[in-house]
């Protein structure tokens, strides 16, 4: 049963200044009826920020009613990254999705994907828009995009993220705009909107500093393609943070130790380092907290998501500029941002994800990439997506964009999961997202393994050191026996045992030896 989405619709049309678009205002219900069964739909938004939710709720409600009448209705949904529970979650619960890409965090969508009810395509965030533009997914029928307002001359004021919104507006045959009057119009001052085009005519990106701008503050849509404008007042999905625990703080401190060592070795500039990227969640927040007390000044971030911790670093002058794809803040963080939006506009740039995650820019700027993971093996291969090799967690997201192209690629993990029943360091990962060729540093609460310039056997010795003490002896035993084989080779493995830890967990609920 879909919640009452009509409560979010409002009659105030003052945010729609253009007469052309004013004449296109319709209800969310009417907008939903325009979307046919089987449509490929591109939704705006990135990590919950700036995602339309009222029209998706209306689509889900329509789907439930059609299903009750014995009629088929499902759409194929492409986004920027994860979205709001009132987009991913409600569509999944209403059995209104046949396909989803490129990234999810909603538990209902995850369950439907892992039970094979929704086909899921796990894609690098920088790549999806280009793949759709090239026709790999077929024609895009609809773009459904949240904006903060529409100017008199028809320009679209972006919301708290753009994700792939501008690409969808360009590509889709038809467009529905959700004008969210809860979003501040001053967001206009933060955005840098540009698209790259396809080879052989793709544009070079002239971004040589984090704060460089190459586009316009507005998005645009061909008025002839816009079939509906829905005016709403909805809150952004807010980030809920749990207090930082000892393990997260230890990981953050170990990252700082690594960075300090790089400064001592003259591989990084003292105080300002190189541009940083960090993922979402408690461990990245712990890294931000550690940066706060480490004495750095003039830091820059070229990243995907701005969280509360990064906002604090900007306010305190530790971070000079942050380029991102979205603002994903708590209630308190959003209040701080809105009250001081003119200040933050001087330090924050919001870009489409084909810019924020662009490999060309990441490599040129020398970004230090910091991302979470599910597990790594003793040789440095990393699994970021599939629990026990089969169950999708969220997706690769932007970790591949940054890990392969960053100056330094760092992966962060607690040494165990499930109360110690799972070791995050295993003989061989059950799924590979980032190969040993792309991983440089792995950090746990027990230290960091610097894998740069090391052979597989040398890497294994470093990885075992940062594993949980409960698992180190077993890892060392596996490695020693693998090395003692007659044909141990370049990367020693015992193939009959390589995935035995995962098999044991599936059968007994623990990886620990009996």
Give residue ranges: language-model regions.
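Conserved alpha/beta enzyme-core scaffold
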Residues: 2-514
């Amino acid at each position: 049963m879909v919640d009452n989405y009509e409560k979010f619709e409002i009659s105030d049309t003052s945010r729609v200044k253009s007469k052309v678009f004013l004449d296109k205002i319709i209800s969310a219900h009417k907008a939903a009826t325009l979307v046919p069964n089987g449509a490929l739909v591109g939704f705006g938004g990135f990590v919950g920020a700036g995602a339309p939710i009222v029209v998706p709720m209306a689509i889900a409600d329509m789907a439930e009613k059609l299903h009750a009448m014995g009629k088929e209705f499902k759409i194929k949904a492409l986004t920027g990254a994860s979205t709001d529970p009132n987009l991913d979650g409600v569509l999944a619960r209403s059995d209104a999705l046949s396909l989803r890409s490129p990234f999810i965090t909603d538990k209902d969508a995850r369950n439907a994907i892992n039970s094979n009810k929704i086909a899921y395509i796990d894609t690098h965030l920088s790549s999806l828009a280009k793949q759709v533009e090239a026709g790999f997914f077929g024609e895009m029928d609809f773009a459904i995009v949240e904006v903060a307002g529409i100017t008199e001359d028809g320009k679209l004021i972006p919301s708290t993220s753009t994700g792939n919104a501008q690409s969808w507006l360009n590509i889709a045959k038809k467009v529905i705009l959700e004008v969210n009057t809860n979003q501040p119009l001053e967001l206009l001052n933060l955005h840098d909107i540009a698209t790259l085009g396809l080879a052989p005519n793709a544009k070079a990106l002239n971004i040589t500093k984090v704060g460089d701008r190459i586009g316009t503050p507005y998005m645009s849509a061909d008025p002839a393609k816009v079939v509906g404008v829905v005016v709403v007042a909805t809150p952004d999905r807010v980030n809920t943070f749990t207090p930082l625990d000892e393990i997260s703080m230890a990981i953050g401190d170990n990252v700082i130790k690594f960075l300090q060592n790089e400064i001592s070795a003259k591989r990084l500039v003292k105080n300002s380092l190189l541009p940083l990227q960090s993922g979402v969640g408690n461990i990245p927040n712990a890294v931000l907290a550690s940066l706060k007390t480490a004495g750095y000044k003039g830091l820059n971030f070229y990243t995907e998501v701005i969280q509360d911790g990064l906002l604090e670093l900007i306010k305190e002058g530790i971070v000079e500029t942050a380029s991102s794809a979205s603002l994903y803040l708590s209630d308190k963080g959003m209040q701080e941002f809105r009250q001081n939006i003119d200040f933050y506009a001087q330090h924050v740039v919001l870009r489409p994800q084909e810019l924020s995650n662009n490999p060309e820019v990441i490599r040129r700027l020398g970004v230090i990439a910091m991302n979470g993971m599910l597990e790594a093996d003793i040789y440095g291969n990393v699994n970021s997506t599939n629990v026990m090799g089969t169950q999708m967690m969220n997706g690769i997201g932007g970790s591949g964009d940054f890990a392969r192209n960053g100056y330094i690629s760092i992966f962060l993990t607690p040494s165990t999961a499930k109360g110690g029943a799972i070791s995050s360091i295993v003989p061989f990962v059950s799924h590979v997202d980032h190969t040993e060729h792309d991983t440089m540093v792995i950090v746990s609460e027990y230290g960091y393994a610097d894998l740069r310039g090391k052979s597989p056997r040398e890497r294994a010795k470093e990885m075992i050191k940062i594993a949980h003490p409960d698992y180190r002896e077993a890892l060392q035993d596996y490695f020693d026996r693998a090395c003692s084989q007659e044909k141990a080779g370049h990367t020693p493995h015992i193939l009959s045992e390589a995935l035995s830890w995962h098999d044991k967990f599936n059968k007994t609920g623990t990886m620990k030896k009996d």
